[in-house]
C-alpha cells in the first residue's frame, strides 16, 4: 500500500468518523432534551439529505479543482458543524450540525474517490485502490460512535461534540501531504456537459442500477433486522451483535479483495453478490436463533461488502476522466436518496405484510435485478 493511499484512507476515515460520531451523539442529546422519536428521525435523516443535493455540485467542483480545495472546504464545514453543537447543544443547532457534517463528509468522499481513481493506472489497480479505500468507512463507523459514546459517558455531550470537531482538522493535516494530480482539461470544442448526459450511457445506467439494488439490501439489514429481533424478544445487545457481525464481515472482505483483485471480474462479483444476497434475504426470516441469524448476517456482509469497490472501479473505467467527479457524485446522490426513502417504504411495507414479507419481497426484487448485472458481462466485452 502506497503512502498516498494511506493518506487518502486516513483522510476519508477521520471525516467520516466525525459524521458517524455526530450521528450517535446528536440524536442522544435530542432525546435527553425530551424531543420525540419523530423529531429524532428527522434529525438523523438530515445527515443524508444534504448529500443528496450536494453530491452533483461537489462532483463538478472536484473535476474543476482537484483534491485539496474541496477537502479544505469540507473540513471547515464539518469542524464548524460539530463545533456549533459543542457551543450551543440545542435542537435547531443540532439540525444545522447534521446538515453541515453530512454534506461535508459526502463532498470530501467524492473528491477523495475521484483522486484515488485517477491515481490508479490499470483496472487491477482500480479494484485494489477502491477495496482499500472502502475499509475507511467500515472503520470510522465503529471509531466515531465509540469515541463519542465514551466521551458522553465520561465528560458529557459538549466534550463529545468538541472531539468530533477535531477529527476533520486531522483530515486536513493528512491531505496537506497528499500529492495533487495535474488538472484534467475538457477536450476542446466539447460543449459543457450536463450530469444527466452520463445516464445516456447504457453501461453507466446498469452500474448505477445494480448499486441501487444492493444498497437497498444493505438498508434492509440495517433497518429491518432490529425490528425482527425485537419481535422475537432478543435483547438490545444481541441485536447490536447481529448488526456488528454484518459490519465486521463487510469490512474484512474489503481487506481480502486487494489481494485477489487481479483474479476478479467486476461484473461476475456483482452478479454473484446479487444472487447470494437474494437467497440469504429469503432465508433470513426463517431463522429463529441468534446464532443462525448471526451467521446469515455475516454471509450478507461478505456479499454486500465486496460490491462498492467493484462499482467504483467500473465507474472510473467507463466515464471520461474529466467527468469522474460527476460520475461519483451522481452515484452518491442515488445512494443517499435511496437511504432517505427506502426505510420509509420498508416501514410501510412491514406494517402491511409483516417483516418477513419485506425480506422476501426485496430478495425476489434483487434476484430479478441480477439480470442487469449479467448484462454488464456483455458491456465489458464490447
Report the location of each language-model feature.
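Residue-level signature of mid-helix packing/kink "hotspots" within the transmembrane helices
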Residues: 48-56, 141-142, 247-255, 339-340
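Juxtamembrane intracellular "pre-TM" segments in multi-pass secondary transporters
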Residues: 1-2, 180-208
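Cytoplasmic helix-loop-helix junction between adjacent transmembrane helices
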Residues: 99-136
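C-terminal membrane-cytosol helix-exit motif in multi-pass small-molecule transporters
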Residues: 165-184, 369-377
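Helix-loop boundary and gating motifs at the non-cytosolic
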Residues: 2-48, 205-210, 215-232
Amino acid at each position: 500500500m502506497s503512502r498516498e493511499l494511506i493518506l487518502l484512507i486516513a483522510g476519508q476515515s477521520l471525516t467520516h468518523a466525525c459524521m458517524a460520531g455526530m450521528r450517535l451523539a446528536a440524536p442522544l442529546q435530542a432525546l435527553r432534551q425530551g424531543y420525540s422519536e419523530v423529531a429524532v428521525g428527522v434529525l438523523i435523516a438530515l445527515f443524508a439529505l444534504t448529500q443528496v443535493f450536494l453530491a452533483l455540485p461537489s462532483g463538478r467542483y472536484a473535476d474543476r479543482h482537484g483534491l485539496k480545495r474541496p477537502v479544505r472546504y469540507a473540513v471547515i464545514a464539518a469542524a464548524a458543524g460539530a463545533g456549533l453543537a459543542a457551543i450551543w447543544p440545542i435542537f435547531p443547532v443540532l439540525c444545522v450540525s447534521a446538515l453541515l457534517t453530512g454534506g461535508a463528509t459526502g463532498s470530501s468522499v467524492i473528491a477523495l474517490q475521484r483522486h484515488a481513481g485517477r491515481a490508479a493506472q490499470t483496472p487491477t489497480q482500480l479494484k485494489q485502490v477502491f477495496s482499500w479505500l472502502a475499509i475507511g468507512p467500515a472503520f470510522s463507523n465503529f471509531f466515531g460512535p465509540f469515541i463519542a459514546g465514551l466521551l458522553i459517558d465520561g465528560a458529557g455531550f459538549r466534550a463529545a461534540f468538541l472531539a468530533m470537531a477535531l477529527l476533520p482538522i486531522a483530515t486536513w493535516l493528512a491531505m496537506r501531504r497528499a500529492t495533487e494530480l495535474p488538472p484534467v482539461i475538457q477536450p476542446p470544442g466539447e460543449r459543457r456537459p450536463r450530469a444527466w448526459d452520463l445516464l445516456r450511457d447504457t453501461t453507466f445506467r446498469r452500474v448505477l442500477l445494480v448499486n441501487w439494488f444492493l444498497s437497498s439490501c444493505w438498508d434492509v439489514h440495517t433497518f429491518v433486522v432490529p425490528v425482527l429481533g425485537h419481535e422475537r424478544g432478543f435483547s438490545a445487545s444481541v441485536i447490536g451483535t447481529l448488526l456488528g457481525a454484518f459490519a465486521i464481515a463487510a469490512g474484512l472482505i474489503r481487506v481480502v479483495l486487494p489481494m485477489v483483485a487481479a483474479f476478479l471480474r467486476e461484473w461476475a462479483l456483482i452478479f454473484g453478490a446479487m444472487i447470494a444476497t437474494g437467497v440469504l434475504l429469503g432465508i433470513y426470516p426463517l431463522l429463529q436463533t441468534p446464532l443462525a441469524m448471526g451467521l446469515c448476517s455475516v454471509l450478507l456482509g461478505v456479499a454486500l461488502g465486496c460490491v462498492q469497490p467493484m462499482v467504483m472501479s467500473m465507474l472510473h473505467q467507463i466515464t471520461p476522466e474529466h467527468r469522474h467527479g460527476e460520475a461519483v457524485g451522481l452515484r452518491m446522490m442515488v445512494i443517499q436518496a435511496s437511504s432517505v426513502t427506502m426505510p420509509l417504504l420498508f416501514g410501510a411495507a412491514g406494517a402491511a405484510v409483516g417483516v418477513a414479507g419485506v425480506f422476501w419481497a426485496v430478495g425476489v426484487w434483487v434476484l430479478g435485478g441480477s439480470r442487469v448485472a449479467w448484462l454488464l458481462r456483455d458491456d465489458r466485452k464490447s
